[in-house]
Each structure stands twice: as C-alpha cells, then as structure tokens.
C-alpha cells in the first residue's frame, strides 16, 4: 500500500463547475470571471494545478519505483495564481479576459487561497511530468472548444 496525495487536477472532460472549464465557458460567453483574492484585492489565490495525464504517469511511476508503506505527493511543476490561469486560458482562446478580484474570504471564513503540495520527493526519484503545464492548458482549452457541448453538463 502506498498513499498518494494530489490536488487541483484538471483536464479534458472536467465538470464545468470547476475553475478551468468555468473560465472557458465564461470567456466564450464574454462574461466576467470573479477571481478570489486576498483582502487587499491585489493578489489572487494560488494552486499547483496538474493535468490528469501527469497524475496517471506519476501513479504508474510509483507502481514500479515507489516503496510500499510510503506517502507521495503528486504536484504540478509550479505554483500558478488563479488570475494567471484565467489569463492563460483567455490567451489560448484569443479572447479578452473580463475579471474582477473579490474578497471571497469574508463570505467564506477559512476558505483557502493557497493549495500546495511539496512534490520534491517524487521528482527526486527521477519522475518527470510528461506534459508541461502550458501544453496541458492549451490541450485542455482546445479540446473544450472543440467539444462545447461538454460545457452544458
């Protein structure tokens, strides 16, 4: 038995309520995107987003290279702010991003603005993400644009 921790997975076919498909949908409709920020409204929350393909590759790597009884964090290659993510999506779509920073924390005390895992143990074992972050976002956005019906669910 090995324990694997993962967070902020994304990819093709992700439910539209999640941040990345929600951004794609709102940008397509020229709607405003509300970005959760710190109370100063200058800095948005951050995540270590990771594509489902990279998660699957990490699990397969651990099956052959991991040690039974150990815990492993599977994380993305870098920390990305939610604003940066929305800007990347708009850029891939060739659209303008209409957004507003909101202090969501005051409405939801305890809401986490930063999700992060230290994946250095896995990377230190020689694991390499097979698909880089920018390529993963581009593929996800393009797939969603080619399958807009998916945004209706």
Roles of regions detected by a PLM:
Residues 27-153:
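C-terminal substrate-binding subdomain of Rossmann-fold SDR/epimerase-dehydratase oxidoreductases
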Residues 11-15, 127-128:
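Residues in soluble alpha-helical coiled-coils and helical-bundle/repeat scaffolds
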Residues 1-12:
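Conserved beta-loop-beta element that borders a ligand/cofactor-binding pocket
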Residues 16-17, 66:
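Active-site loop immediately N-terminal to the catalytic Tyr-X3-Lys motif
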